[in-house]
Structure formats: structure tokens, C-alpha cells
């Protein structure tokens, strides 16, 4: 009997336990406690993961009971705590994926439908406008280029008009064709009139530069003695008509008559004889005339012809008047007369008093 007991095979097993370890003291306490148990061969503790590996011929139940009696909660180690629960079939995830794919396809279809033109009054208006443009091209009418902003505004106005006509046509079944034709003719007529006005504006803008040449020709005619040719320059874009008379170059007084509709007043002449030029002359002929200065805008000083030549006469633009160091003739006559009277009085006094030293 004893021989059989001595040679009994020992079954060595390895268990992994989860034990609450918070500090170094807990680590040492658990290790000592497990090593004292009979049949434990090796103990390994991982404090970070609270994992204890025990190898020996001992059941896991005895190890857990010993640790619980010592005040340490212990259980078998499992990497996933919910591993023991039966796994449910993943039907919910499959349903969610199918729903998401259906939503994506629906959003793509809605985006494509949003890009398509709707069958509304505005769409019909634009289609009608395109048809009207085609009819104009077939008729062979001359079309002038229009600015981008004006074209956009006209398109909006025509769209509003056509939308109103379409709304009325829905109620009246018998007047649909006639009202559409009338609206198209009115819109075409408005477009033609606006195109003609734009072309006229472009032509008048191109002819604005010819006013300078006409002004120069009028000045040359003034040299020949025709007193300048009147040149009328019309400005239809601004709605203002101005008539400008070219200044003759042979004018002696240097005063030019500007016939303006905005009622400019008469202009004072400066002392040098240069007139206040029109802005067109200031732009085109800058080197032919002297620029205006404020200090020259006063009347010139004209000396009297009866007094003869004055000493130190200074012409304008200086504001002070000449200084005369010599006395005038009248002052000299008065002084000589007074001196003669004084000498006569002195002689009378000398005769009375005795001699006078001359």
C-alpha cells in the first residue's frame, strides 16, 4: 500500500486568477498566501492587469477560497468579461447596413431630381422666351449687343410677365394661345426697343470725342475772322444738352461767351489776359494756355498817364503800390512859398533887431 502511495502521479495544472491588487503590500501579501498553500509550485503576479498565475496540483476552487478568507476578492481570469455569454446573431447590424445603403441611394436620386428643371411657370416662361428668340432669328431682325446686367434684368421682367400670363391661361382654356402670342410679341417689342436704345448710346459715346475736334476747328475759324463757329454737342445718355461756343483766338478783350444750359455766370478775367478755359480745352490743349492761379484773379493796376513816369514802378502780380521817394511838383511849390515867406519874416525881424547872419 505504501509503495503505491509514494509513486502516485502528481497532476500539475496552471490557473490564472483575477485578484484585487492595489499596492506593493497587497502584492506581497497575495504571493505569500499562495505559496503557503500545499501543492502550489509557482506563483506569478502581474499587478498592472491584476492577474495572478498559479501552477501546481491544486484546484482553483481551493485557491479562491483561501484568498477570499484572507480578504482578497478572486475569480478565474477571462480576458473578456462577457465571454461566457452566448453570442447573439448579428441580424441587427445587417439590417442597419441595408437601411443606410437605401438612404444613400434615395439621397442621390433626390439630388438628381433637384437638378432637373421643374414644370413650373418660370420654366415655361424661359422656354417660351427661347422660342421667341428663335422666331426673331428666323424673321431676320437686326439684334444689337446688350450689356450683361441689362440682359439679366430684362430676362427677370419677361419671366415675371410670362408667369403672370401662364397663371391666367390656366383659368381660361379658350384664350391660352392668343394670350401667349400677345405676351411674346410684347416681350419681343420691348427687347427690340431696348436693344436699339443701347446701340444709340454706344454710337453717341463713340461720337463724344469729336467735340474736341469741332472746338479746335472753331478756334481756327476765329483766327480767320469768323468769330468762332458754334458747335453744339448733345449728350443723350445723361439727358442734358449743352451748346458750347468755341472761343475765338483773335478776341482783344480775352472774354469768351459760354452759352450753357446750366446757366454759368460771366467770368472775370485775370490781369494777364488769359481767359478761364472750358474743361475740354484744359484736357486737350494743356501746353497752349497758362494754368489758373488764385493770386492772378484780380484786376490789373493801370498807372495814370498825366503824372508821367513813376520811379520804381512794379507791375502786378505784386499787391503793394509803388513808393515815390521824390516830392511832387505841388509839394515843391508849397515848400518854396513857405520858405520865401519865412525868409521875409526873418528879414523884418533882423531890421528891427539889428543884423542877421546869412
From Swiss-Prot:
Where are stretches of biased composition, namely Acidic residues?
128-141
Cysteine methyl ester-modified residues are 355
Binding locations of a metal cation: 23, 26
Q: Where is the HMA domain?
A: 12-75
Q: What is this protein called?
A: Heavy metal-associated isoprenylated plant protein 37
One GO molecular function term? metal ion binding
Gene behind this chain? HIPP37
Q: Which organism is it from?
A: Arabidopsis thaliana (Mouse-ear cress)
Propeptide residue range(s): 356-358
Where is lipid attached as S-farnesyl cysteine? 355
Task: Please provide the record's keywords in A-Z order.
Answer: Lipoprotein, Metal-binding, Methylation, Prenylation
UniProt key word Transcription regulation: no
Amino acid at each position: 500500500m505504501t509503495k503505491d502511495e509514494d509513486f502516485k502521479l502528481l497532476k500539475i495544472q496552471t490557473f490564472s486568477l483575477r485578484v484585487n491588487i492595489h499596492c506593493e503590500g497587497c502584492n506581497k501579501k497575495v504571493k505569500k498566501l499562495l505559496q503557503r498553500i500545499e501543492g502550489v509550485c509557482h506563483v506569478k503576479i502581474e499587478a498592472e492587469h491584476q492577474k495572478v498565475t498559479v501552477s501546481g496540483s491544486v484546484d482553483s476552487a481551493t485557491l479562491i477560497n483561501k484568498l477570499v478568507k484572507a480578504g482578497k476578492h478572486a475569480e478565474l481570469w477571462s480576458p473578456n468579461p462577457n465571454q461566457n455569454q452566448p453570442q447573439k446573431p448579428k441580424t441587427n447590424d445587417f439590417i442597419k447596413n441595408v437601411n443606410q445603403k437605401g438612404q444613400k441611394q434615395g439621397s442621390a436620386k433626390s439630388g438628381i431630381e433637384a437638378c432637373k428643371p421643374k414644370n413650373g411657370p418660370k420654366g415655361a416662361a424661359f422656354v417660351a422666351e427661347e422660342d421667341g428668340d428663335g422666331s426673331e432669328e428666323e424673321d431676320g431682325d437686326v439684334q444689337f449687343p446688350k450689356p450683361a446686367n441689362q440682359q439679366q434684368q430684362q430676362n427677370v421682367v419677361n419671366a415675371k410677365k410670362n408667369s403672370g400670363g401662364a397663371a391666367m391661361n390656366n383659368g381660361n382654356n379658350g384664350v391660352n394661345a392668343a394670350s401667349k402670342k400677345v405676351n411674346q410679341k410684347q416681350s419681343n417689342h420691348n427687347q427690340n426697343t431696348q436693344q436699339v436704345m443701347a446701340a444709340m448710346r454706344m454710337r453717341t459715346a463713340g461720337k463724344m470725342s469729336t467735340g474736341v475736334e469741332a472746338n479746335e476747328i472753331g478756334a481756327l475759324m476765329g483766327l480767320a475772322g469768323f468769330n468762332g463757329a458754334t458747335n453744339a454737342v448733345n449728350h443723350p445718355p445723361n439727358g442734358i444738352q449743352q451748346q458750347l461756343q468755341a472761343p475765338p483766338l483773335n478776341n482783344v478783350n480775352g472774354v469768351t461767351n459760354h452759352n450753357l444750359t446750366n446757366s454759368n455766370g460771366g467770368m472775370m478775367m485775370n490781369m494777364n489776359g488769359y481767359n478761364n478755359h472750358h474743361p475740354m480745352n484744359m484736357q486737350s490743349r494743356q501746353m497752349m494756355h497758362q494754368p489758373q492761379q488764385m493770386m492772378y484773379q484780380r484786376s490789373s493796376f493801370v498807372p495814370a498817364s498825366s503824372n508821367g513816369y513813376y520811379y520804381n514802378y512794379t507791375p502786378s502780380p505784386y499787391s503793394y503800390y509803388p513808393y515815390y521817394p521824390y516830392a511832387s511838383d505841388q509839394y515843391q511849390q508849397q515848400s518854396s512859398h513857405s520858405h520865401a515867406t519865412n525868409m521875409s519874416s526873418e528879414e523884418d525881424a533882423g531890421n528891427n533887431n539889428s543884423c542877421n547872419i546869412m
